[in-house]
Amino acid sequence: MRNEPLTGYLLHHKPYKESRALYYFFTQTHGVVHGVGKKGMPLFAHIQLFASGKRSLKTFTQIQPLTPQVAITGQNLYAGFYLNELLWKLLASEDAMPVLWQNYQHSLTTLREPLNGVQLRLLLRFFEQALFTELGYAITLDTDSQGEPIKQEQDYRFIADEGFVNYIAAQKSEPTEFAASSIFLGKWLQQIDDYLQTHQEQVYSLKNHDKAIQADTLKVWSGLHKLMIDHLFDYQPLQSRALWQQQARYR
């Protein structure tokens, strides 16, 4: 790159020198770009800057917001930290993902609005689903690992690299103790899939979504996604998740 204009969002920053910082900048055209620039780039703001450099670490100059910044507050702020951590830790450098970038931009817009607890969890599940798809880990909810339709009264074990494995068949071939959190009843998977089939096109409009999904279904969906996130992070703790849980205890 040679003084190339980039627009996007700051995902993360680290101290670099007295007046400079190392930035992880998420762009629509180049994915996550690593660069060094003057300290002070704000999170969650739509930003334009100029990037130069042939190596993986660029030099960022002329950093400026493109639109007035509307603050993200409360629980929504911690959700924003979580989205950022997923992206800067999981995405490869300079690998464009324009669909995921648009999803992230819309998610930030929604996080600037008042959301109840159910709407906030739904926003996160939709975003995680888009991320899994981009990373090649899309979760198939209507068939098991052998391509057979999910059965309502059947138990399945979720394995990130395989999908849903028939629990009874797996136990017969290789009896093993599994964590209860990895076992899912088919009817819950069907309910999640039915919800997605109905509401996928309305992902950016969460109004009345909280009335369209049962609390138990959302809880199961959240547990399923947590298994995938833990797998992708090799079971290392997420800083944003710990921060969110910590502040929740002191509210």
Label every model-predicted segment.
Residues 1-18, 26-251:
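Non-catalytic alpha-helical scaffolds and adjoining flexible linkers that form interface surfaces
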Residues 22:
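Histidine-centered divalent-metal-coordination microenvironment in nucleic-acid enzymes
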